[in-house]
């Protein structure tokens, strides 16, 4: 039964023994946000009239795509069915489920003592659930296995509870069966959270230490920082210090979100809440950082803090060059809310002024691009995504390349590219086609495990550059949509990579340059010149389109010249007269060819850069 507001313990005065911090781990579309909605309703923190689906997903893109991008934290009062008078406080931390946001997930997990592992009873375990489960196990969290959507006709609760039990090492009977849509079994789940998740452990009179697990930008109040207090206490109007940057701020407001913000006097050990310091830049409150009080503060930060590193780079250019200032302002505003987004201005001879933007992965790229187009009304061209290469020259110098046009000329001794460890889960009948796909993408098989007789987990080492194009789309189409993919960076390897330039009429077009593996360079060149031949309109003179590695041309197509019929006014008559006219035309064409320049229409850029087979598309990565 929902706890009535009169017996709910106040923040800062809650006994840590009554607090339970937990999160929900689930693959996309397995019903995590719906389960969160049911919990909000059952505990009575959201009025029935204000309830809407996916209550915690505030961004339009989150609601439409059904994905959670930013973590949320909600304080839920709950009195277990066995002891109705004893109200506990459950802090539910809603985590992103996507592989691009793994660091955010790991920080959210570090703020919890337990986790609900939610699996769709019709689909079973997917790769991203598995990746987050391993993260939870590394953090020694208590895992509560739950099967969702048991009201579906296609549900197979017995089969999947067996699979879950094998994975975690519990009995199939321990797997709870719920339907987040109808609310069936959710009360039992909340009771189990109270019974099984350990209470937070911390020293109440030690110097205050709190971990930031998320920060969001509010246009009225500045940055709102979500924290979990580990030791000590934070009080209103205290001065605090960020331990990674040493910056100090005053706590203007402190409180809990339930799920709307409720100010309080302070936060004690084990509590999860928010702080407002009036800071205007999210980069000053970094996810994973430790907060302490300015006087008598802690000397040792909590472990696990990392700066998010961009993995994938893409150039973003406005279709209309005059929108450049708007694009800069839009990126500035998005960066307030997304500390992992990095960008710097760049110019392209072909596309004009734009920005080189760094992302955590393909979904991150897609979401940012969609937000720029939707929230700021910008029309953009995005160049094909690139990864970061490290190039060692024979003279010992080293270059970091995030853009093909920066690839150094001259004698190169080694090129290093980032590699990832990919985990693919799929029905066992597709093993052959998955292995074939990974082999063509220069993958190395690490191992293979059967989770049950018809589901298999395949592990590969793959170059990140091979994944950022259309790997996910290909994987889905080869497995009829059943495979799921997860990857994590594992360092770098030396590869024989070359830069392929596209020359139009002898001039390089920087927007079409690409860094590819030596073996794939010829195919890339042939495909691109053939495509450009179709897209570039015919000129009054002949235009060669060439693909070249350095000074060696590897592929060529020619756009034939348009010819005017100069013989139209000659009726019969002398052949030498006709020859004279044709020679004169030929001379003119030759002169034109020497001074002429080729205009590449905007449509050709868009078609080439967003085409599936040249790899500019990240659409399938949802």
Curated annotation (Swiss-Prot):
Belongs to the TRAFAC class translation factor GTPase superfamily. Classic translation factor GTPase family. LepA subfamily. CDD domains: EF4_II (cd03699), EF4_III (cd16260), LepA (cd01890), lepA_C (cd03709). GTP binds at residues 29-34, 148-151. SMART domains: EFG_C. It comes from Streptomyces avermitilis (strain ATCC 31267 / DSM 46492 / JCM 5070 / NBRC 14893 / NCIMB 12804 / NRRL 8165 / MA-4680). SUPFAM superfamilies: EF-G C-terminal domain-like (SSF54980), P-loop containing nucleoside triphosphate hydrolases (SSF52540), Translation proteins (SSF50447). The gene is lepA. This is Elongation factor 4. It is an enzyme of class 3 (hydrolase). The keyword Nucleotide-binding applies. It comes from the Bacteria.
């Amino acid at each position: 039964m929902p706890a009535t507001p009169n017996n709910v313990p106040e923040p800062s005065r809650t006994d840590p023994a009554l607090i339970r911090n937990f999160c929900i781990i689930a693959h996309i579309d397995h019903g995590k946000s719906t389960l969160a909605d049911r919990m909000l309703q059952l505990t009575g923190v959201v009025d029935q009239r204000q309830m809407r689906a996916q209550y915690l997903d505030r961004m339009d893109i989150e609601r439409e795509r059904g994905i959670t991008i930013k973590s949320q934290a909600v304080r839920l009062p709950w009195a277990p069915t066995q002891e109705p008078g004893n109200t506990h406080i459950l802090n539910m931390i809603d985590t992103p489920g996507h592989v691009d946001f793994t660091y955010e997930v790991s920080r959210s997990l570090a703020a919890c003592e337990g986790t609900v592992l939610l699996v769709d009873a019709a689909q079973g375990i997917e790769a991203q659930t598995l990746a987050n489960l391993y993260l939870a196990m590394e953090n020694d969290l208590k895992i509560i296995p739950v099967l969702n959507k048991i009201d579906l006709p296609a549900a197979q609760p017995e089969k999947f509870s067996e699979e879950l039990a094998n994975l975690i090492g519990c009995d199939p009977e321990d797997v709870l069966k719920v339907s987040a849509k109808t609310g069936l079994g959710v009360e039992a789940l909340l009771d189990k959270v109270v019974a099984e998740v350990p209470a937070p452990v911390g020293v109440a009179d030690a110097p205050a230490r709190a971990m930031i697990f998320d920060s969001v930008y509010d246009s009225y109040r500045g940055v709102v920082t979500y924290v979990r207090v580990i030791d000590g206490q934070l009080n209103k109007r205290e001065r605090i210090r960020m331990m990674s940057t040493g910056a100090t701020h005053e706590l203007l407001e402190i409180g809990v979100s339930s799920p709307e913000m409720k100010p309080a006097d302070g936060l004690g050990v084990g509590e999860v809440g928010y702080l407002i310091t009036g800071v205007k830049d999210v980069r000053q409150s970094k996810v994973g950082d430790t907060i302490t009080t300015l006087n008598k503060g802690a000397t040792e930060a909590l472990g696990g803090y990392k700066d998010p590193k961009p993995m994938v780079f893409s150039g973003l250019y406005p279709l209309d060059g005059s929108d450049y200032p708007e694009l800069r302002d839009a990126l500035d505003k998005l960066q307030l809310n997304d500390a992992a987004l990095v960008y710097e201005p760049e110019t392209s001879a072909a596309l004009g002024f734009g920005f080189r933007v760094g992302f955590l992965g393909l979904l991150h790229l897609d979401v940012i691009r969609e937000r720029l187009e939707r929230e700021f009304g910008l029309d953009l061209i995005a160049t094909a995504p690139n990864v970061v290469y490290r190039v060692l020259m024979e003279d010992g110098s080293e270059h970091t390349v995030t853009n093909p046009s920066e690839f150094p000329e001259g004698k190169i001794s080694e090129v290093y590219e980032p590699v990832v460890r990919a985990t693919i889960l799929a029905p066992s009948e597709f093993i052959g086609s998955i292995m074939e796909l990974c082999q063509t993408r220069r993958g190395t098989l690490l191992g293979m495990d059967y989770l049950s007789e018809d589901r298999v987990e395949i592990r590969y080492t793959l170059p990140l550059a091979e994944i950022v194009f259309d790997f996910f789309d290909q994987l889905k189409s080869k497995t009829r949509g059943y495979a799921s993919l997860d990857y994590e960076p594992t360092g770098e390897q030396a590869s024989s990579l070359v830069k392929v330039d596209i020359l139009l009429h002898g001039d390089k077009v920087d927007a079409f340059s690409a860094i590819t593996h030596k073996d794939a360079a010829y195919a890339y060149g042939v495909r691109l010149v053939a495509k450009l031949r179709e897209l570039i309109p015919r000129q009054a003179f002949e235009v060669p389109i060439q693909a070249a590695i350095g000074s060696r041309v590897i592929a060529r197509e020619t756009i034939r010249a348009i010819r005017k019929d100069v013989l139209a006014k000659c009726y019969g008559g002398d052949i030498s007269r006709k020859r004279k006219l044709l020679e004169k035309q030929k001379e003119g064409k030759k002169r034109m060819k020497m001074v002429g320049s080729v205009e590449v229409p905007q449509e050709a850029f868009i078609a080439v850069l967003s085409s599936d087979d040249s790899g500019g598309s990240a659409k399938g990565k949802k």
